[in-house]
Swiss-Prot record:
Function: Mediates inactivation of the TORC1 complex in response to amino acid starvation. Required for meiotic nuclear division.
One of the GO BP terms on file: positive regulation of autophagy
Position of the signal peptide: 1-21
Disordered as annotated region, ranges: 53-113, 246-310
Gene that specifies this protein: NPR3
Keywords: Meiosis, Signal
Highest taxon listed in the record's lineage: Eukaryota
Protein's name in the database: Nitrogen permease regulator 3
InterPro entries the record matches: HTH_NPRL3, Npr3
Ranges of compositional bias, category Basic residues: 246-262
Record-stated family: Belongs to the NPR3 family.
PANTHER family: CGTHBA PROTEIN -14 GENE PROTEIN, GATOR COMPLEX PROTEIN NPRL3
Length: 844
């Protein structure tokens, strides 16, 4: 069992749709066979990911016939009439009804797909210039009639095969280099090899018709969790189905109207019997919601006032488009799609099945499906992209001479995927999603041009309880702490009301902590700049916050920095806005694994060597040797062929370079490993060395060598306190009895008090009682607590009432001092005064 290790168990991702003519498999990735998909080695971090370069061994000889020796820079985009970015954005912004009739079906595909050929497939220079000359002559024709004629000629050239050139004109035009690089990065060359490639007509040895039928459930099974197992594979998804009116999602206005009608029908039902039908509809709706359907899941608000203004090029494309039978077929197909599903195919172990599948569903499947449903309801994005993919497949398989000239099936498969990825942004998003989730990275997907969604399965590298390393290994350098960052992020897609309240409460406590960067600030800033999506304000705030962050300072003190960066003179940016912005930035750094929350580092705190410190092993991901060290040594097999030192000695070199004047890493850890833990300030020689030692402490906590030792407190009530409270209750009871006798009537209070005293007699038999929840204590427990502090001075009694709610064994004293602003000496005085009524627990 290895549930603590990052392993998504994802082997393939598939997009299916359901139409009036039946289900269809639109796209799946990767096209690898069953053996490769289920037995491939998983990489867990980008630093150990290996990149493969594809080489077509069987096609090298044939490629020499039309190789000109021209470099990629010479085959530039100088002859392109318009950029691919502009063309693709114009396609996505066209109305759905006219989208498939536009000029993109021929002309846009011609220059888009040129740059996706392999380097061995470059044609000769003479043929290139001939084609470019012919294209220039066609482009030079002006006027409305000439444009129509050029469109007809291009469509004709697409449908007719050329006898002089193995690659038609539509595969020679210039391409966008950035998009070409993006597609090259998305495709894994190791998949398109003879021993790993699976024919695109099959999905993991299953026929595409079977997978399409399996992943297209009927309407009653849609809009809820879909989970189906075939052999060792799990098909997991969230199928989205349109209603009988073709709506993909109920708008908020329709929801409110339906709720009002349901309430009114219920009210009328009390005075009339003519509303039985309405009541039955209301009962059916409530039954559907109780079954776990997602129609009321909160999604982005609708843009009611958004006005669409097409550009001139889009208007020309729509004006001069020439419909044909093929476009009519795809347009009718687009209009007939009533269901789509992004299905994640997994192969988890039986013992890990529930946890792996639940994590995938909660963190990835639900979020991706909901954002696609929202965009589909707004713009018809999913159906439009499905038609793009199907048209691209049809054009390549039927009209591409270069595709027919390829000999090996894996070469054809790679070329087909290149063309699809270049055409469809949804295919690129699904491919990137698979690559990132498969490698346990964060998938930052751009959907429909302006929608960004980040998906990840959190890596388990933090524990509040020491795991059993013999049964379940963990990553080297995992954090051992009671401050779990996951509790501040939470499962946003599966929060119950109670969990949601706890999550918001954690957000309120967020600014009381410090933030420890998990990498050098320069590296984090570089990563933020590469992952930015032209949001200048957010990038500015994040970069400046990363530069100023220090683990010794509370996050709440950075509100002034946010004010200065935004606009300190603008009255609209109040303290609440700056605080909310600061929380969002901190949560962003935590979610993207750039930082983690800790209590602010101080020389007064106590730190110990973590039991999970990365001492052995050869890398952070080298959990295999941690599990099988003994077995490997018994077999006398070398555990490392490169003769690399273990992690402690690798980090020793880095530590010495960063802190040359401090003791070596093993010596420093030896200083921290005392028999009785002491505050960190005891090992600091002088105040001049304090800053350097605190920086070293932050470095050691970043790599999991040290963890903070916290103090938790319980209140213990002994038998003497119980007897004293019991006597007070008896006195109060006697007074109440005298008052009742003078009134000549008896109430039910005597029976209640007598039963209470019977319970007290049973409780008094115990020596002591620990109050687990002083904030939610009963009346009797409250008397016990006040009795414990009755003999204290007045100032300590006030302090006790202020902090007793935290004495539940869950909130550390170190956090109490930060939260309430209480000096450490005052807390120490209070604990000494309470004496035997306090139970202290040391824990990380």
């Amino acid at each position: 069992m290895s549930t603590n290790l990052p392993n998504s168990c994802l082997v393939q991702i598939a997009l299916t749709v359901s139409t009036h003519s039946g289900p269809q498999l639109i796209y799946h990735y990767p096209p690898s066979n069953y053996a490769t998909a289920t037995n491939s080695k998983k990489t867990h971090h980008p630093d150990i990911k290996k990149r493969y370069e594809y080489t077509d061994s069987e096609n090298n000889s044939s490629s020499d016939d039309y190789s000109s020796g021209l470099s990629d820079s010479e085959l530039s985009t100088d002859y392109a009439d318009c950029s691919s970015d502009a063309s693709e954005s114009s396609l996505d912004s066209l109305p759905q009804s006219n989208h498939e009739d536009t000029v993109n079906s021929s002309t846009n595909n011609t220059f888009i797909n040129n740059g996706l050929r392999s380097r061995q497939s470059q044609i000769s220079a003479n043929k290139l210039f001939q084609v470019l000359n012919q294209n220039n002559n066609n482009v030079a024709i002006n006027g409305e009639n000439s444009l129509r004629e050029s469109l007809h000629s291009i469509r004709t050239s697409t449908n007719m095969s050329s006898t002089t050139d193995p690659r038609p004109e539509d595969e020679l035009d210039a391409v966008d280099e950035e998009l070409k690089i993006l597609v090259d990065d998305l495709l894994d060359g190791s998949i398109f090899q003879q021993d790993t490639f699976q024919d695109i007509s099959k999905v993991l040895n299953f026929n595409t018709e079977f997978v399409a039928e399996l992943c297209s459930p009927r309407k009653e099974m849609c809009n809820t969790r879909f989970e189906f197992t075939v052999d060792d594979l799990c098909f997991l998804g969230l199928p989205i189905h349109a209603d009988h009116k073709g709506r993909w999602k109920k708008s908020k206005k329709r929801k409110q109207a339906s709720k009002r009608s349901a309430r009114s029908s219920t009210a009328r039902n009390s005075i009339s019997r003519n509303s039985v039908g309405r009541n039955s509809i209301g009962r059916n709706r409530s039954k559907t919601e109780s079954q776990g359907h997602i129609n009321d899941v909160e999604e982005p608000a609708d843009d009611e006032n958004s006005d669409y203004e097409p550009s001139k090029s889009e208007m020309l494309n729509e004006m001069y488009c020439v419909p044909d039978a093929e476009n009519d077929e795809f347009e009718s197909l687009q209009q007939s799609i009533n269901m789509f599903q992004v299905c994640f195919i997994m192969n988890p172990k039986i013992i890990e099945y529930n946890e792996r599948v639940d994590d995938m569903y909660h963190y990835v499947v639900t979020r991706l499906s909901l954002i696609l449903r929202y965009i589909q309801g707004k713009t018809g994005y999913v159906t439009r992209e499905c038609v793009k993919i199907m048209k691209c497949k049809d054009e390549v398989s039927k009209h591409s001479r270069y595709y027919e000239s390829l000999k090996s099936p894996w070469s054809k498969g790679k070329y087909m995927y290149e063309r699809i990825l270049y055409e469809s942004s949804l295919a690129r998003a699904l491919t990137k999603c698979f690559n990132c989730i498969h490698n346990n990275e964060i998938a930052n997907l751009e959907i429909d041009g302006d929608k960004i969604v980040s998906l990840q399965i959190p890596i388990k590298n933090e524990f509040s309880i020491l795991p059993n390393l013999k049964e379940d290994a963990v990553l080297r350098g995992s954090f051992l702490s009671s401050i779990l960052n996951e509790s501040f992020i939470g499962r946003s897609t599966s929060l119950t009301n109670e969990d949601s309240d706890n999550l918001y409460a954690n957000h309120d406590r967020l600014l009381d902590y410090g933030l420890l960067l998990l990498d050098e600030p320069e590296n984090i800033i570089k990563g933020l700049e590469n992952a930015s999506f032209d949001n200048g304000v957010t990038d500015l705030l994040l970069i400046n916050l990363v530069r100023q962050l220090k683990p010794t300072i509370r996050l709440g003190q950075y509100k002034l920095l946010i004010k200065e960066l935004i606009d300190s003179n603008d009255s609209s940016y109040d303290d609440q806005f700056c605080e909310t912005t600061l929380k969002s930035l901190c949560l962003h750094l935590i979610y993207w694994r750039h930082a983690r929350l800790i209590l602010p580092i101080s020389s007064r705190n106590t730190y110990i060597v973590s039991p999970l410190a990365p001492i052995s092993g050869f890398s952070t991901d080298d959990f295999k040797h941690g599990e099988y060290d003994t077995l490997i040594r018994q077999q006398e097999v070398p555990v490392n062929n490169n003769d690399e030192p273990s992690l402690i000695y690798q980090n020793k070199k880095v530590f010495n370079e960063k802190f040359p004047s401090l003791p070596s890493l093993p010596s420093f850890l030896q200083l921290m490993s005392t028999q009785k833990p002491r505050p960190f300030g005891h090992i600091i020689p002088s105040n001049e060395h304090k800053s350097m030692y605190l920086n070293a402490l932050a470095w050691l906590m970043r790599y999991g060598y040290l963890t903070q030792l916290l103090t938790f407190v319980y209140v213990r009530v002994d038998k003497r306190i119980k007897i004293a409270v019991d006597e007070d209750l008896e006195k109060d009871n006697l007074r109440s009895n005298k008052h009742e006798k003078s009134g000549n009537f008896v109430t039910g209070g005597e029976n209640y008090n007598s039963s209470e005293f019977d319970d007290l007699e049973m409780i008094n038999d115990n020596d002591f009682t620990i109050i687990l929840e002083p904030e939610r204590n009963t009346a009797l427990e409250k008397r016990w607590l006040y009795k414990c502090a009755e003999a204290l001075p007045t100032d300590l009694q006030t302090l006790f009432r202020q902090v007793v709610k935290y004495f539940n064994g869950k909130v550390s004293l170190e956090y109490i001092m930060i939260k309430e602003g209480i000096p450490k000496n005052e807390i120490k005085r209070l604990l000494q005064a309470l004496g035997k009524y306090i139970v202290e627990v040391k824990h990380w």
